[in-house]
Structure formats: structure tokens, C-alpha cells
From Swiss-Prot:
Predominant subcellular localization, coarse grouping: cytoplasm
Name of the protein: Imidazole glycerol phosphate synthase subunit HisH
Upper lineage: Bacteria, Pseudomonadati, Pseudomonadota, Gammaproteobacteria, Enterobacterales
PROSITE patterns (UniProt xref): GATASE_TYPE_1
PANTHER family in the record: IMIDAZOLE GLYCEROL PHOSPHATE SYNTHASE SUBUNIT HISH
């Protein structure tokens, strides 16, 4: 099975590639439109700012390709945030608008920001993304921005506020 990890130049590619490899797949790291469209599954990791990642996607001519893919697509960290419609980061900017949600700054007077640590994740809706994973399992978080719980939320957690840990719309997951 063909698995592609989109390379925006703003991602933790080696850790994602290693994790996918441990599941028995040989992922390809690529910016090729052809490889992306021919793949069976797509991973879209990201680290850094929404502005730099959106700039990279535009420069690589991948904005419309990502919006048009039909195969399963998993956004990880910044990759998830870019699937939304708007980010408060960098004085606010429009993102890919694949799933209608804003990405908001995590604000807390009680806890340090960025949020850095392990949280229990509560599955809110039955979804293939969590097959074989026990409800309230721990996941690692390192972020300063959140997606509030919304109609696309399939799992949530809390750090000062409750927020989406995973969302799903059609073939797009985060």
C-alpha cells in the first residue's frame, strides 16, 4: 500500500516515517502531486507556524491538491490546524478551509502555555481512527493553539479548557 507523508519543510518527518514504518508500511516523503494523488493514505505532519507552512504549500503548488484528495488524509499537529478555516496565529490568517473550524490561541492563567504533556483523550464519537485504542488513553500534546469542541470533534481532552483532540470530516482526520 502506498503511503505518502507530505513534506512542507515544516515537519517532524523522521518520527512520523518511523511510526508508520513500525505499522508495516514503507512511507514515501514527498511533495510530488503525482505521488500524493496516487497514494492510498496521506499523512500531513507539521511543526512551526501556520504562516510558514501555508507559504510552503503555496510555493509547492499543493494547496488545491490537498483540498481535492479523496483518500484518507491525517493532519498531525500543525497539519491538523491547517485543515481548519482560520488561525489566530500570526495576527490571524486563512488556512485550507477543509473543515470549518477556527484555530484559537490557548489561553490560561492557571497552567503554563504551551501545553506540554500527556493527557487522557475521551472518544466522543465512534470512528475508525480510534479502532483498537481504549477510551481515555493517554496522548502526548505540545501546542499553544486549540480547536474548540465542535460538530466535527470525535475526541476531546482538557488543559484549562476542553478542546478537540481529534476531528473528522469525510476523508480528513486530525
Amino acid at each position: 500500500m502506498s503511503v505518502v507523508i507530505i513534506n512542507t519543510g515544516c515537519a517532524n518527518l523522521s518520527s512520523v516515517k518511523y511510526a508508520i514504518h513500525r505499522l508495516g508500511y514503507n512511507p514515501v516523503i514527498s511533495t510530488s502531486r503525482r505521488e500524493i494523488l496516487r497514494s492510498k493514505k496521506i499523512f500531513f505532519p507539521g511543526v512551526g507556524t501556520a504562516h510558514s507552512a501555508m507559504h510552503a504549500l503555496k510555493k509547492l503548488n499543493l494547496l488545491n491538491i490537498i483540498k481535492d484528495v479523496q483518500q484518507p488524509f491525517l493532519g498531525i499537529c500543525l497539519g491538523m490546524q491547517l485543515l481548519g478555516s482560520y488561525s489566530e496565529e500570526s495576527q490571524g490568517m486563512h488556512t485550507l478551509d477543509i473543515i470549518n473550524f477556527p484555530v484559537c490561541a490557548l489561553k490560561s492563567e492557571k497552567f503554563p502555555v504551551p501545553h506540554n504533556g500527556w493527557n487522557n483523550v475521551e472518544v466522543c464519537k465512534n470512528n475508525i481512527l480510534f479502532n483498537g485504542i481504549k477510551n481515555n488513553s493517554k496522548f502526548y500534546f505540545l501546542h499553544s493553539y486549540v480547536v474548540h469542541v465542535n460538530e466535527y470533534t470525535i475526541a476531546k481532552t482538557a488543559y484549562n479548557i476542553c478542546f478537540s483532540a481529534a476531528v473528522n470530516k469525510d476523508n480528513f482526520w486530525r
